Amino acid sequence: MIKTIVWSFIILVVLLPLGAEGVELKHIKTFQGAGAPKAVEISPDGGYAAVMNLEGMDFWLISTVTLEFIKKCQFARTPAEGWDYKAHQPIKSYAQKPVECDFSGNGRFIWISLHNAEAIVVYDTAEGPVVPNLLYERLKVTDYITGNSSEQTAIKIPTEKTPKVIKVTPDERYAVVANWHSSSVSIVDVQAYKTIKNIRVGGNNQYIPRGVAISTDSQKAYIANQRGGTISVIDLTTLGVIDDIPVTPNPRHIVLSKDQRTLYISDNINGKIIAFDLITKTKTKEVFIGKYARTIALSPNEKYVFGVSHDEGKLVVVDTTSFNIVYKEDVPYPMGLAVTPDGRQLWVTSYQMGMIYVYEIAGEPQP
């Protein structure tokens, strides 16, 4: 195995009193050298973390057990039109810029959105046979287990413009993709590797959809419209929008509680985490965590919600009962985060610094 991981333990920690809450994060490793890590997700079996490096145009697979690299997968580059989010105008770029991801087959398949490709890709971690008559993206894969490098492919599925968050339904029938610049959501047949419908959200209101959450029965998709300030509800049986619920001015990331009643929302510009009751359609709780609140995640026992403030460089832990911040830590430019299924690790990406921080979640009984 190649062991060339560069890591550091240089990080500032700000502890709030533990008191009755009893949660604490222990920093255990830092990975450096990522090209603008946008997102991190943990495989359903908890075995590995998948890191999406937007500007690096690659993704990393890292063991959650050994904290060693498993694979680095580099896309072959082709020119494409990108988007300058500060100047609000098109720019010259490349198609293969990974944004977000999800899984099927208990982590065997990784579903990845490509920012400038108007497409998503599916990578088979088991490197199974190529499926004929489909589109593909090319990858150079370095395997850190075998020490070998090889040319591989990932199935390419057209969507609409600027796909971002992608979620596979629990029954693995569909992948639901939010298309930022098309005001639409693509519904992809997971087995056929084909987009079967593009659903417009917001009518003529020019919504910007980003966050996606799926009900546990795979019957509904909730879409956070970052421009629009609403949650669009899609019926996954009829494949149509059945509701459009005003929630907060700038909803970015959403997570659904296990009882399907509470939707946790990050309000990006206003820097808040919000608890929203889907039955009464009312905001029940909110807490300010710092400007530009990005990704959020629930602990498996739903006692805590983890969140980051990108501009203020804060990682916070919020008690879901009191909705108080019970722990905070300084992290430079945090963007993505994910919790392992056993509730023992938290992974956080630092976008501008090109780092991924790994924490042990301590002081809290595991689910």
Regions found by a protein language model. Give the residues of each.
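Bacterial N-terminal signal peptides that target proteins for export
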Residues: 1-7
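Predominantly soluble domains enriched in secretory-pathway, periplasmic, or organellar proteins
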Residues: 13-367
